[in-house]
């Protein structure tokens, strides 16, 4: 029986790497599928991992009807055994509904990968809907680490080295062009206390920030 499975974690927990590995495993067994993504750090229409791996993908625009897209390809005779959905936190809730329809109505496995919450600790709408609908929600086992060495559970946004907890999910317009925006992962204790790596003089802040958007 087909399933909708959501793999989630913080930044640096290997979500896109696992998405690419999952696609590779299916392809190596002769299975054919589709890969979707949204706002990948490497640009439009590509899924990339921090390890340097990447693959072409279908960009999920806000108005894309994923279910209709898949049905049309099946109607043209295309074979689709599985679907990979990276950066699923950025999908619209109705697009997540479409993924569930693909699983239940078409019998196609859907593997979604994403981040649960934004820098304000608020669930992304796409992730919230996946938690509500997925057959399984799996937390990634590769643990990202806070600067203190503890397991990182929260994503933090910093502006000029100072952690911010307010503002829109859309980065553009939040700050001026001269401001330095970055993201890093923190344990809950240091996220609540707003103690970043720079503030603690402890070291690394991610040099490859993700574009947290609605």
Predicted regions and their residues:
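Residue-level preference for the first positions of well-ordered beta-strands
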Residues: 4-6, 32-34, 81-84, 109-111
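Walker B catalytic acidic pair
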Residues: 86-88, 114-115
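Conserved P-loop
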Residues: 1-73, 118-129, 142, 170-173, ...
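Short basic (Lys/Arg) and small-residue
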Residues: 134
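Conserved RecA-like ASCE ATPase "motif II neighborhood" in helicase/translocase motors
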Residues: 59-84, 92-96
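Short recognition patches in nucleic-acid-associated and regulatory proteins
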Residues: 142-175
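Sensor-1/coupling segment of RecA-like P-loop NTPase cores
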Residues: 103-126
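Conserved ATPase-coupling elements of RecA-like P-loop NTPase cores
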Residues: 88-99, 119-124
């Amino acid at each position: 029986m087909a399933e909708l499975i959501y793999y989630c974690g913080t930044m640096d927990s290997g979500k896109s790497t696992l998405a690419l590995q999952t696609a590779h495993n299916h392809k190596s067994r002769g299975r054919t599928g589709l890969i979707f993504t949204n706002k990948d750090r490497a640009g439009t229409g590509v899924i990339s991992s921090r390890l340097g791996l990447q693959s072409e993908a279908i960009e999920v625009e806000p108005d894309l009807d994923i279910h209709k897209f898949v049905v049309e390809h099946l109607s043209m005779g295309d074979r689709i055994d599985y679907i990979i959905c990276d950066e699923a936190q950025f999908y619209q809730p109705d697009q997540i509904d479409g993924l569930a329809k693909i699983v239940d109505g078409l019998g196609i496995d859907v593997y979604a990968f994403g981040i649960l919450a934004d820098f304000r600790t608020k669930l992304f709408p796409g992730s919230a809907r996946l938690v509500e609908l997925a057959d399984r929600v799996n937390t990634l086992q590769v643990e990202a680490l806070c600067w203190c060495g503890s397991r990182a559970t929260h994503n933090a946004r910093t502006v000029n080295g100072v952690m911010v907890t307010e503002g829109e999910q859309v980065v553009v317009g939040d700050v001026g062009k001269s401001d330095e925006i970055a993201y890093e992962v923190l344990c809950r204790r240091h996220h609540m206390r707003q103690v970043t790596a720079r503030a603690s003089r402890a070291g690394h802040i991610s040099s490859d920030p993700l574009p947290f958007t609605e």
